[in-house]
Amino acid sequence: MRDHVGIPIEMAIASVDQRLREEGIRHKCSIIASGGIRCSADVVKAIALGADAVYIGTAALIAMGCTMCQKCYTGKCAWGICTQDPELSKRLNPKVAAKRLVNLLRGWSLEIK
């Protein structure tokens, strides 16, 4: 495990898929790719390399209006996306954020087709 920490997601997916197949347990688990998924091409690449699903955390946040101020962990997100603070969360319009996220996913879906 230690030898594979920090490798690019493409190499990690292929390596995990291959190892699970060698062990005969690939059918017993799912590979979910996370990190570095920035566009629909990255989704296609991950699936082609053996991932069963992808996680698109940062792309989804940016679609919702995140400016990458990197304060998520503080709970003081300037745009109200990653916060529990009632005053800051007023800055996020959930309907607009949802529409933007739907547009991102719909666009990626059309590109993948």
Language model regions located:
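C-terminal extensions of enzymes
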Residues: 95-113
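Glycine-rich phosphate/ribose-binding loops and adjacent secondary-structure elements
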Residues: 1-89
